[in-house]
Amino acid sequence: MANEPVILNVYDMYWINEFTSSLGIGVFHSGIEIYGREFAYGGHPYPFSGIFEITPGDATELGETFKFKEAIVLGSTDFTEEDVERIVEEMGKEYKGNAYHLMHKNCNHFSSALSEILCGREIPRWVNRLAYFSSCVPFLQSCLPKEWLTPAALQSSVSQELQGELEEAEDAAASASTPTCAVAPAPRPARHQPRR
């Protein structure tokens, strides 16, 4: 059995936390690290997965407003790396980019759900305290900058997904107008592909 550690990586949205920490509220992003990969979730306006992958603990891939805060070992799992890939892919059906909601379905909700599946443990409550606070102040989500909802790594994934769909449409249009049989090009691997 694998007995692989399940790690919660927490990122500080450092400039806003200078103001909110005195209120006892932090603004945090999180992802789950397993098998040397980190899976996280963010919002975008499209009906495909908002789950993306980054190098564990690398805040630069998320964007300039993020700073790595800490790694918390939540437990361990006997799921294999292939099992984890299937689980994340299946979760992508629920965690679509256009389903992101600050209070009900954010990156921390995803991290907690994945952690529960992998090792039976939720993430610490303090990581997602903003969701509770924003439920008390309903207009808060509309005041937050877009980059809080869509980290840079996810923006890259979305661009790649949309480019792939555009190329598929162009290929389909070209093959429809060409009477000869064409072989579809092999998909290009990308570092930050969204999970379907």
Curated annotation (Swiss-Prot):
* InterPro entries named among the record's database cross-references: PPPDE_dom, PPPDE_sf
Under Enzyme Commission nomenclature, its number is: 3.4.19.12, 3.1.2.22
Indicate the enzyme's highest-level EC class: hydrolase
User: Where does this polypeptide localize?
Assistant: Cytoplasm
Keywords, alphabetical = Cytoplasm, Hydrolase, Protease, Ubl conjugation pathway
| Gene Ontology molecular function, alphabetical | cysteine-type deubiquitinase activity; deubiquitinase activity; long-chain fatty acyl-CoA hydrolase activity; palmitoyl-(protein) hydrolase activity
Record's catalysed reaction(s) = Thiol-dependent hydrolysis of ester, thioester, amide, peptide and isopeptide bonds formed by the C-terminal Gly of ubiquitin (a 76-residue protein attached to proteins as an intracellular targeting signal); S-hexadecanoyl-L-cysteinyl-[protein] + H2O = L-cysteinyl-[protein] + hexadecanoate + H(+)
Q: Which Pfam families match?
A: Peptidase_C97 (PF05903)
GO BP terms in the entry: convergent extension involved in gastrulation; proteolysis
Bias (Low complexity) = 172-185
Q: Does the keyword Cytoplasm apply?
A: yes
Instruction: Name the residues annotated as catalytic in the UniProt entry.
Output: 29, 107
Q: Spell out the GO cellular component terms annotated for this protein, sorted alphabetically and separated by semicolons.
A: cytoplasm
PANTHER family from the xrefs? DESUMOYLATING ISOPEPTIDASE, DEUBIQUITINASE DESI2
The record's function comment reads: Has deubiquitinating activity towards 'Lys-48'- and 'Lys-63'-linked polyubiquitin chains. Exhibits palmitoyl protein thioesterase (S-depalmitoylation) activity towards synthetic substrates 4-methylumbelliferyl-6-S-palmitoyl-beta-D-glucopyranoside and S-depalmitoylation probe 5 (DPP-5).
**Protein name listed in UniProt:** Deubiquitinase DESI2
Annotated organism of origin = Danio rerio
Q: What is the lineage of its organism?
A: Eukaryota, Metazoa, Chordata, Craniata, Vertebrata
